[in-house]
Amino acid sequence: MRLFQLLFRASPATLLLVLCLQLGANKAQDNTRKIIIHNFDIPKSVRPNDEVTAVLAVQTELKECMVVKTYLISSIPLQGAFNYKYTACLCDDNPKTFYWDFYTNRTVQIAAVVDVIQELGICPDDAAVIPIKNNRFYTTEILKVE
């Protein structure tokens, strides 16, 4: 009986502290989903005029699908398939991989860019979202010609 009397006399701050210790910290903000996860792979070095294959793997952790446009940008002009732009529907259960084959005889810095865009006719039933915070993601690599 005396225990219950002590419990009812406890200050609100003490009760709040006990409640927080029982519930634990809120981890809702620790598990934010990543909009775009990308992995850009090119060789570190090649010989002049060797064919180079650039590979960009893209995925998302969002539950909703997005329309993405992927392309490469270089520090010097490159010709051929390097200039191809790909548009695809990216969903969490369907990652995409894009390939570019090109030639170069000079060292070049290359950026792989992923833009989240609004375009009809790409995702099923045109059901796609556009993130408010970020809609462009990129990574850069240097391709040395030796």
Curated annotation (Swiss-Prot):
<dbReference type="GO" id="GO:0010628">
    <property type="term" value="P:positive regulation of gene expression"/>
</dbReference>
<keyword id="KW-1015">Disulfide bond</keyword>
<protein>
    <recommendedName>
        <fullName>Prolactin-inducible protein homolog</fullName>
    </recommendedName>
</protein>
<dbReference type="GO" id="GO:0004190">
    <property type="term" value="F:aspartic-type endopeptidase activity"/>
</dbReference>
<feature type="modified residue" description="Pyrrolidone carboxylic acid">
    <location>
        <position position="29"/>
    </location>
</feature>
<feature type="disulfide bond">
    <location>
        <begin position="65"/>
        <end position="91"/>
    </location>
</feature>
<comment type="subunit">
    <text>Monomer. Interacts with AZGP1.</text>
</comment>
<dbReference type="GO" id="GO:0001580">
    <property type="term" value="P:detection of chemical stimulus involved in sensory perception of bitter taste"/>
</dbReference>
<dbReference type="GO" id="GO:0070233">
    <property type="term" value="P:negative regulation of T cell apoptotic process"/>
</dbReference>
<dbReference type="InterPro" id="IPR007990">
    <property type="entry name" value="PIP"/>
</dbReference>
<dbReference type="GO" id="GO:0005615">
    <property type="term" value="C:extracellular space"/>
</dbReference>
<feature type="glycosylation site" description="N-linked (GlcNAc...) asparagine">
    <location>
        <position position="105"/>
    </location>
</feature>
<keyword id="KW-0732">Signal</keyword>
<feature type="signal peptide">
    <location>
        <begin position="1"/>
        <end position="28"/>
    </location>
</feature>
<dbReference type="GO" id="GO:0019864">
    <property type="term" value="F:IgG binding"/>
</dbReference>
<keyword id="KW-0964">Secreted</keyword>
<keyword id="KW-0873">Pyrrolidone carboxylic acid</keyword>
<dbReference type="Pfam" id="PF05326">
    <property type="entry name" value="SVA"/>
</dbReference>
<dbReference type="GO" id="GO:0042802">
    <property type="term" value="F:identical protein binding"/>
</dbReference>
<keyword id="KW-0325">Glycoprotein</keyword>
<dbReference type="GO" id="GO:0006508">
    <property type="term" value="P:proteolysis"/>
</dbReference>
<dbReference type="GO" id="GO:0005634">
    <property type="term" value="C:nucleus"/>
</dbReference>
<dbReference type="InterPro" id="IPR013783">
    <property type="entry name" value="Ig-like_fold"/>
</dbReference>
<dbReference type="GO" id="GO:0002682">
    <property type="term" value="P:regulation of immune system process"/>
</dbReference>
<feature type="disulfide bond">
    <location>
        <begin position="89"/>
        <end position="123"/>
    </location>
</feature>
<comment type="similarity">
    <text>Belongs to the PIP family.</text>
</comment>
<dbReference type="InterPro" id="IPR014756">
    <property type="entry name" value="Ig_E-set"/>
</dbReference>
